[in-house]
Amino acid sequence: MDLIRKIEAQNKKNEAFVFNVGDTVRVVYKIIEGSNERLQSFEGIVISFQNKGIGKTFLIRKISSGIGVEKIFPVYSPIIEKVEVLRRGKVRRAKLYYMRNRIGKAAIKIKERLTIKKVKH
């Protein structure tokens, strides 16, 4: 068991992505087609996390032309260039699978979490 943790620690890059379930994020990732390499972005709401050590993944959902599209991204994947948090969401669940049943504007509607900065005098 100790050997597994040692290998996971070597392959883990710094987890610079700080976001939670309910946040609206934009993931920029590499697509390699033959010898060409380009960047593509996917923007949506984080529905869930699967915590499996180095195999940690997150699921993003967006509505494209009235159809729900979901994509799973591995957190420690080398193809992910960056993850931008566009909006912080306020939710009370760890898995937002109920969003799949929503239609129209309600499918992307989540309350925004306000962040208050403390000012030192």
From Swiss-Prot:
Keywords: Ribonucleoprotein, Ribosomal protein. One of its GO terms (biological process) is translation. GO terms for cellular component: cytosolic large ribosomal subunit. InterPro entries: Ribosomal_bL19, Ribosomal_bL19_CS, Ribosomal_bL19_sf, Translation_prot_SH3-like_sf. One of its GO terms (molecular function) is structural constituent of ribosome. SUPFAM superfamilies: Translation proteins SH3-like domain (SSF50104). The keyword Ribonucleoprotein applies. Gene3D superfamilies: 2.30.30.790. This protein is located at the 30S-50S ribosomal subunit interface and may play a role in the structure and function of the aminoacyl-tRNA binding site. Belongs to the bacterial ribosomal protein bL19 family. This is Large ribosomal subunit protein bL19. It comes from Borreliella burgdorferi (strain ZS7) (Borrelia burgdorferi).
